[in-house]
Amino acid sequence: MYSEPPLFEFRQVGVSIDDVVRLENLSFSAFRGEFMLLHGATGSGKTLVLEMLSGLRKPTEGEVIVAGDRINDYNELERRSLRRSMGLLMQGGLLLEDRSVLENVLIPAVVAEESFREARARARIALEKCGLAALADLRPHELSAGQRQLAMLARAGVNRPALILADEPAAQLDDRNAQTLIDLLGMFAQAGVTVFLASHRIPRPRNVKVRVIELDAAARRE
């Protein structure tokens, strides 16, 4: 079905915390341009999976492969580099209140050591795609909850990552803003970005098929 190798893979992955098994025997792969949903109830281990994929947590057993590399044994510098290569839309994500919306969005591009001019131009394009171009000079506290989340999505996508990780990104939004956010994530997938979303709800982006990975009894224990 796919001519290219997976963008990332979980191979027989398990996680134990304080001698309690939280995940076990988790195996799946994701390919370029897929919109994937990691579906499960609160406490099922969705965030643990995202933490492993972004290098914030090591699996107790099994392998996590990203772009052909086994990341289990990455050192801290390699883990930071891995996270910088991804777009992260995580729970508890923050915008800096002493910076404008535009300045917040361009931060990843500046960290990637791009020229400020190029970073600024990319940030404006990202804001335009997310419908926030007119709000670029505002401070985060002047935005609605939905606008803040869209600004964080613009920041996640500003470096044109191959992979966007999203942890319950629409959990605090009303139905209209939630659908807007999901549709924008779908647009990233249409452009070839792999979107990996963890949620207890099943999103329905327009014009994009969602592949669902269920965190059920075969992959976790509570």
Q: What would you call each of these model-derived segments?
A:
Residues 71-87:
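ABC ATPase NBD coupling module
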Residues 70, 106, 117-135:
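Conserved ABC ATPase "signature" region
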Residues 160:
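Conserved catalytic motifs of ABC-family nucleotide-binding domains
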Residues 156-157:
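ABC ATPase C-loop
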Residues 164-167:
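Catalytic Walker B motif of ABC-type/P-loop ATPase nucleotide-binding domains
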Residues 54:
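Helix-to-loop junction immediately C-terminal to a conserved catalytic motif
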Residues 62-71:
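Conserved ABC transporter NBD signature motif
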